[in-house]
Design a protein with these regions (language model features):
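N-terminal intrinsically disordered/low-complexity leader segments
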Residues: 1-12
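Membrane-interface starts of transmembrane alpha-helices
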Residues: 6, 148-160
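Helix-turn-helix
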Residues: 12, 16, 24-58, 62
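Alpha-helical DNA-contacting segments of helix-turn-helix folds
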Residues: 60-67, 112, 128
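Amphipathic alpha-helical linker/stalk segments
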Residues: 63-90
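Amphipathic alpha-helical packing segments from all-alpha helical-bundle domains
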Residues: 69-73, 89-92, 96, 100-107, ...
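Amphipathic C-terminal alpha-helical segment
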Residues: 101, 134-139, 160-178, 192-197
Length: 197
């Protein structure tokens, strides 16, 4: 972001820009979303948009950052709300939450994932990794006799990245010979088997 909004009015303007961007991506696709279209949909002039963002990509990166932060918070809330349920039940719930988030907002994430090579430098993946790692630490700390910190760190990294990549690839290119439900079961089984090692 070029200029972080400080006043409430500025924050509202940025929120309008981000919401309009999400709507434009859903309506026109990522490649055909332009700053003038965002301006038209948001009711914010192109000049005002450029006060906050250098270009369309910077707007999308901020939207990705915020959505990743929200997904991370939702995962933390899910884990805390579930209390001490066994991992065999918690992992499928977390995977379901992830799939729902990737498909939400009229396919925003799906459209961005189709062009991930343009946004792979975004903070979104690091934000999700951080939240998921914290969830892993919280979850595994309930079984301290089973894993030490180094094991948790290593297993979390592998689980987070392999699961995220698989889910992202599936929702962005849904032409695989596996149903979503079957993939969810396979991911859960894979994670549980890996944790049992």
């Amino acid at each position: 972001m070029r200029k972080a909004p400080q006043q409430q009015r500025s924050k509202i303007i940025v929120d309008h820009i981000l919401e309009a961007t999400q709507q434009c991506i859903a309506q026109y696709g990522l490649l055909h979303t332009t700053t003038p279209k965002i301006a038209e949909k948001s009711g914010v002039s192109v000049g005002s948009i450029y006060q906050y963002f250098e270009n369309k990509d910077q707007i999308i990166e901020e939207l990705l950052r915020r959505k990743s932060e929200l997904l991370g918070q939702q995962l933390k809330e899910l884990v805390i709300q579930q209390g001490n349920i066994p991992l065999e039940l918690l992992i499928p719930l977390a995977i379901e939450l992830g799939f729902n988030a990737l498909k939400a907002d009229h396919g925003f994430f799906i459209e961005v994932l189709k062009h991930w090579h343009d946004y792979s430098h975004s903070q979104a993946a690091q934000i999700l990794e951080k939240h998921f790692f914290e969830v892993g630490l919280y979850t595994f700390s309930r079984n301290p006799h089973q894993w030490d910190f180094e094991q948790v760190k290593h297993k979390s990294f592998v689980i987070i990245n392999s699961t995220l990549f698989t889910m992202m690839r599936y929702v962005s290119q849904n032409n695989f010979l596996i149903s979503e439900q079957q993939l969810k079961r396979e991911l859960s089984s894979m994670i549980l088997a890996y944790l049992s090692q």
